[in-house]
Amino acid sequence: MKVYSGSDIRNVAVVGHSHCGKTSLISAMLHAAKMTPALGRVADGSAVTAYDDEEVARQTTMANAVAFAEWNGVKVNLVDTPGFHMFVHEARAAMMPVESALVVVNACSGVETMTDRVWKYATEVALPRAIVVNQVDHPKADSRLGRQQMIEMMQQRWGRQVVPIELPIVDDKGFHGVVDLVTMKAYMYQLDGSGRGEAGKIPHALEADSQAAHEALVELVAEGKDELMEEFFREGTIPEDHLITALHEAIREDRIFPVLYTSGLRNVGTDHLLDFLKVYAPAPAEREPIAARATRSTPPAHSNGEAKPGDGYVNEEMVMRRMDDKEPLALYVYKTMSDPFAGKISFFKVVSGVVKNDMTVENFTRHESERLSHLSVMQGRKPAEIQELHAGDLGAVPKLRSTLSGDTLGDRAHEIFLEPVSAPEPVMTYAIEPKSRGDEDKLAPALHKLMEEDSMVRFFRDPQTNEFLVAGSGQTHIEAIVSKLKKRYHTEVTLKAPKVPYRETIRGRAEAQGRHKKQTGGHGQFGDCKIRMEPLPRGSGIVFENDIFGGAIPRQFVPAVEKGIHESAGRGYLAGYPVVDFKVTVFDGSYHDVDSSEMSFKLAARIAFRKCMEQAKPALLEPVMRVEIESPDEFAGALMADLNSRRGRVQGMDTAGTGTVLRAEVPMAEMLNYGTTLTSITQGRGSFRMDMDHYDVVPQHLSEKILATAKKPAGEDGED
């Protein structure tokens, strides 16, 4: 395997909406570069970057995958990304180790919801990008969305910087070539799947369109560049070598978003796309220096292993690190994968320096040493071992002990910490139960391995309901987790809707006496307290106040009263849910010199608490979620109607590109399976996020149903 310098590397994320043909396009590029003996197909599982069993079964990419093509002296690293909304966070993570992106657009559907989202991600990180209109060979491509209409749609969304650098050649043979608007040559394909075009003259029918498009491209490239503008107005054009240099610079600076045309399935235009990446895509060596924190003091202490911004920083000093072989070694781990044969594989970018096989490095995030044995580059799931990798390249290494995604590794003497890409919070949670005792023993280790490779997986125990919960980005995601547990780790589980963490409260004021007295042989038990309970605003918790004067209850027993109140509140009154948002004041009582004790006053407080609850208008509270829903405009009405049916309160509606963002407050009980409904309403083009916002009183008719099915706490505490 050849070793490449940073100037001869192109790192490219391939992003776009689900089913726009990203994986097929990468397979076609690899075949055109003769990296694979045949054209890989997603449908039969032969595509290089679609190797996971779940991905093949569902015919959709669910995690980032890496492949590379060696093309005319450069190495093109391609990061395939999911386009389905449940996994689109992976596309954001894929933008960290690359210098450019190919935004793939379906020739029939045009710009879709996730296309807009990944474009937004790329804009946020100022990532240079080109647009690839794929599946141009589809019979309905031209009739459903003509070429000019497609360009206008993209310009409307993303600005006039969107400009064709190619024109598709479509005639009675179908799509079988492209016109290069820089060199003004046509490239024709035999449609044999080889992906190799032959240069020739532009077809007569496209001469006028090609000339007009060439002039529009030249004018946009020259815009804002005085020397080029003068040359353009003086000569009427710009020499080809000047145009290539200027176009490369314009793409790197996000002043132009060029449009190319391909067919991944028939392998048309892919060799020209590789040529484009070689000539115009930024190399790692051209990247601006990367900002990094100088150091950190302690490793993060989080159960899911995530590095959190701000954890353990010694200071906020920032350093700039150039992507250069001469800089100290630094590696950023952008992906972790669990392989049934190799174990855990860590995918990394060489941010600076040169990494060599069998080198020992420091994990700056966790303050542990790691040995880099079997240094490799990945072709899908297959590693190709290599002796060294230079600044800017992408590599992988198996069996690192402590390293997780988001970690920074490198030369111990030059510690830096690169900010990890934060994952969004999961939006769907299920209770998970092992089917057998053997499954129970294997469940936690298996889920923790899945959490290592997927930042959206969460596994935890609910402290209120005591259930084990698994959380993910949607129904499909959680189903995939369960399938992986069974197939990969031989662990079978049952999914159930999680219990809603209801709470209880009071809406009125009450006073009560709790008197605990028990006489047995020897010392007896005696405790007597009077308390007052009153409601507090939502979110106040429990407030305890001591208003005892004159020693009615000795000072040493007052904490026992408070403890008894807290214990009773934790057990609930109506249905065993914790009681919150109230103030309790102990204002009187009595004691016995011999028989009183902490336990006696704790039991007395429990009795007083239950009496007060009975009189203070107890009520059931439910968690209310803050929900944000993104979808195309045409689904806004149906989504609002659905939210209203779920007792939701719409708080506002905003515009996001050509889509709509709905903001609402909805009870958690109504949102447990919302992901499935949203997919149905929006035809898979919507997404949502939700976070806990506040608790509110459950309507009476629903409260009665909930209480009727809930298990009530048994027995009284103490004696009156």
Question: What is the predicted function of each stretch?
Answer:
Residues 1-720:
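Structural and coupling elements of P-loop NTPases
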